[in-house]
């Protein structure tokens, strides 16, 4: 099973680095749609991703049209504070694409309007001062919901202590 994370028009390098680390740790593919508000060799981006960059399967696209053209037939789910469906109420199929917009504006409303049944939101309090979650946190919530539904394929689900055994 393959999970695809799509980031559209990113603005903050640290978020991208954190998301890249999440993708590396979960085996998810990362798709980045330009333009971006920073360069991919940005020092802050590299630091946030630590030494996980070699574990990434990452593809860049010039714009949304380029992305959709190269991923025709994909099963897309659009995360947005404007959506009417809760992210955990959706059943995510194999090879799903979970799509996130830029930090300041989210995804284009035309895209959301044209795909109402594929738009999902992470529940939050009803307070206009709490506009949204941090992008990297939202991606992590989305990724782990999909992986939970899939039974955490190929992920370690039990840890080990360094000084003790759990059975002692």
Model-derived regions, located:
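Post-transcriptional modification and biogenesis factors for structured RNAs
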Residues: 1-168
């Amino acid at each position: 099973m393959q999970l695809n994370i799509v980031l559209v028009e990113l603005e903050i390098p640290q978020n991208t680095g954190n998301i890249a680390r999440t993708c590396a740790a979960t085996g998810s593919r990362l798709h980045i749609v330009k333009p971006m508000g920073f360069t991919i060799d940005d020092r802050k981006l590299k630091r946030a991703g630590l030494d996980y960059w070699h574990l990434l399967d990452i593809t860049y696209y010039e714009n949304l049209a380029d992305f959709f053209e190269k991923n025709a037939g994909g099963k897309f789910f659009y995360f947005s504070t404007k959506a009417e469906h809760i992210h955990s109420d959706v059943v995510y199929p194999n090879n799903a694409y979970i799509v996130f917009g830029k930090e300041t504006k989210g995804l284009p409303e035309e895209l959301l309007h044209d795909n109402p049944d594929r738009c999902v939101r992470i529940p939050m309090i009803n307070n206009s001062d709490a506009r949204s979650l941090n992008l990297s946190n939202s991606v992590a919530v989305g990724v782990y919901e999909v992986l939970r539904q899939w039974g955490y394929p190929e992920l370690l689900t039990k840890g080990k202590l360094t000084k003790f055994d759990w059975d002692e």
